[in-house]
């Protein structure tokens, strides 16, 4: 069986979820994922001027299309720039799936450069937030994220993606 990276698996999952448009801003922890998104031709990635705008653009996209808004930012300040937009989406019941880059697993909790506990910071303004700890869990977490964002009272979901998890190879 052919093995693919977590980055390729996420791109595949976006297509399976019917995500034809997303909003993304690349950075050190998400550059490989951004490269995978660039290589494919199904999901259009809109690059805003900065992260604060992109979560609001994803929110507006969700409100105007009835689809789940999707966005991608890097770690640290990229992730914290989502907070106001996530709060808005939460209070207005707008379905979003937001991906944040994160430092490698062995650096989490060690005050690494641009490491921030974004799941903890956004706990009260998201329906669900998780840091992906194992490559094997990625597919399940992605399916759950879209399901949770759109069911019941819609709202934002945050998936934190450690760089090493996304680089790992595994089954498709």
Model regions and ranges:
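N-terminal alpha/beta PP-like core and its mobile active-site loop of ThDP/TPP-dependent enzymes
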Residues: 1-172
């Amino acid at each position: 069986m052919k093995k693919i990276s977590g980055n390729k698996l996420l791109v595949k999952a976006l297509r399976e979820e019917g995500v034809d448009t997303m909003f993304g801003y690349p950075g050190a922890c998400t550059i490989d994922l951004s490269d995978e998104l660039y290589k494919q031709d199904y999901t259009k990635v809109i690059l805003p001027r900065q992260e604060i705008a992109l979560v609001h653009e994803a929110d507006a996209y969700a409100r105007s299309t009835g689809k789940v808004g999707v966005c991608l930012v890097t770690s640290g300040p990229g992730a914290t720039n989502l907070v106001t937009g996530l709060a808005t989406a939460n209070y207005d019941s707008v379905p979003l799936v937001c991906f944040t880059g994160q430092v490698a697993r062995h650096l989490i909790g060690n005050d690494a450069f641009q490491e921030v506990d974004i799941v903890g910071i956004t706990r009260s303004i998201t329906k669900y937030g998780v840091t992906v700890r194992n490559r094997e869990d990625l597919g399940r977490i992605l399916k759950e994220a879209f399901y949770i964002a759109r069911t019941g009272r819609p709202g934002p979901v945050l998936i934190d993606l450690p760089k090493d998890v996304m680089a790992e190879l595994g089954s498709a």
